Amino acid sequence: MFAFCKDNVTIGIIRVIAIFVRICYICCMTTYIKSPFPYAGCKYPLLEELDKEIPAGDTLVDMFGGSGVVGINMAYKFNHVIYNDIMEPLVFMHKNMYLDPLDTVLQKARDLSSKIPEKYAELRNAYNNLIEEVKLMHYHDTDERWKEVGYRFFGLMLSCTNNLVRFNRKGGFNQTCGKRQLTDPKVAEITLWKQKLDEIAPKMQFFSQSFEAFDGLPDGTVVYADPPYSNTEAGYNGGWTVDSDARLAKFILEHMNHKWVFSSCAKDGSTTKLVDTLVACGGFTERRIDYSYKASKKTKESKIEEIILVSK
């Protein structure tokens, strides 16, 4: 374990950090486990507010799972948790951390992460070539090549600029190399995340499907929906458009037998047609929360208003 550490002192530091964070999590109800991957749109800053709105139940579906912080931190309320995201590499990255031993995950982190631009570019090219192959050949999701896709994406997420996912128009990963390296605190974050996944493993399922594939959920299922933003052209939104918003609004309104918790950000007070449609139907209570968000040390802090809708 921790074979890549230089000496026992480093090992001790990592363990102390992980234990300290774990104690904080157990002892303080307002402390939540942070994802080691600050994925764009991550709802970690809002977990305390979302915790107030997401009711306990049998099954939680995190329909647009992203970083996974909502489903994993809310798992204590449910017997079953479904993580779903349309982006397959992201799902397989999470599945690898869920299925593989901690030693394997950390060794992969050591082998694949790099702040050396040439090594990073080599990994990025290898990832883009492999993802193109598995999609072209329609490999089954149990194929080992999908597992490797997940780990290569893992390495890119650890190393890319600000951990922000960016794709070109052909779907290739094109974010630049960052200046981060695999620090002891980052290893501790990965360790804590993995330990939490191990704890809730019997509850977890992972899918990469369109939201429309969840047509047959049992009555009373709690569904958390934080879709990509159609009002952005960012490369991480997976081609989500205003038409996608319209389809999701229709799906939600046709499935009000579920308990919906919906969130979306509003910059400068603007909302999407999706939010307006749900509010207009009269079937949701609405909360607006102001919070600050900073994507990186170099970016200015932005004031964002988060809209939370909860079905009545």
Region roles according to the model:
Residues 44, 67-70, 87-90, 159-162, ...:
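Short, solvent-exposed loop/turn segments at secondary-structure junctions
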Residues 42-56:
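Conserved alpha-helix/loop element of class I SAM-dependent methyltransferases that forms part
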Residues 59-125:
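SAM cofactor-binding core of SAM-dependent methyltransferases
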Residues 241-312:
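Long, positively charged, glycine-interspersed low-complexity recognition regions
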Residues 79, 198-204, 282-284:
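A short helix-to-beta-strand connector/capping loop
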Residues 14-44, 102-224, 228-234:
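SAM-dependent nucleic-acid methyltransferase catalytic core
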